[in-house]
Amino acid sequence: MPNLSSVPDEAHTEPRPAESATPKRRKSRKVSNPTSPPIPAEAADTLPDWPEFIRNSSPGDVERRFAKEAAAILASEPVVANNYACVALLQPERSIGQFELDQIFAALAKSNPDSAKDVLLLLLSPGGGIEPAYQISKVCKTSAKDKFVVCIPRQAKSAATLIALGADEIHMSLLGHLGPIDPQVQGLPALGVSQALETLAVLVERHPGSANMFATYLQNSVRIEQIGYYERICESAVQYAERLLSSKSALPKPAAEIARELVHEYKDHGFVIDLAEAMEHLGDTWIKVATPEVMAAERLYRLFERVNLFLGFYKSKVLWIAGSVSEGIFIFDRPKTRGA
């Protein structure tokens, strides 16, 4: 599957929970502290700060407390609480795939079955697969009453940018940013093949005596069908982006031009398309800043980062959200880094 992610290959696999290879919610009775009771609602004000709580609690207890505090953050902002069915993809180290698509679909089917509310997607992701990202965007739009809103507190790169292109509004914090949507194949840019061939052609033209050497190298390194495949998946990314953009009004440029720029213009897959550049590409009527949605997302992001900091330090685990902010919380063993 063509991938738009810049995360390491190890993070492209399905998540590995601390006790099972199958992604599923942790249950406190299966962890090392089976006697930990559920957190009483009336004890919320007496709970210790997160570092101490994480050090002494089971993953199930951490999930429950995080879910309660996250729900309180969203409920405290009337614009968010009253107008939106909220879902989230907060996964800074994992690629978007079928699992994420299924989680978003299930959460919206449960929380907004009759499309009575608009949809707000809180998005933090390095990217992932083209196809599931496109489908997530379409599912969110179809499930919304009137509008689908994406809120980006930090990075929404690559395939996450593709998701955002299908939104009616993109709300960004000052540190929020998008990224190019050029596909990656085994961690390398698909566009790099044709660009490498062009570079070799220029070198041969300058140094005709090197032609046989380069011809032998290419014969042993690249198959003709690979070149065609890489070209086609790049054009596929353009098509997906153009389809999501085509329904938008008041774009500063034609949808096809914007889509092509996002695939072909940038030389580095990790390039930061910040707030100002996003407005230049997409228009300042589409990009929103300093909104109640952004304020709620910032508060949730700070909670998310704080919990993950101490989960990693004390437990070597990571918390992700995929789908419902209250029920789509998962704690896994932290993925090993390269060379570890």
Labelled PLM ranges:
Residues 152-156, 165-166, 171, 179:
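Hydrophobic/aromatic-rich structural module bridging two neighboring secondary-structure elements via a short loop
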Residues 91-92, 167, 175, 181:
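Fold-independent oxyanion-binding glycine-rich loops
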Residues 1-149, 171, 184-340:
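N-terminal organellar transit peptides
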Residues 125-131, 154-158, 177-178:
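Acidic, metal-coordinating catalytic cores used for nucleic-acid/nucleotide bond scission
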Residues 160-169, 174, 282-283:
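Active-site-proximal glycine-rich helix-loop-beta segment
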Residues 159-160, 274:
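Conserved sugar-transfer catalytic core signal across GT-A, GT-B, and GT-C glycosyltransferases
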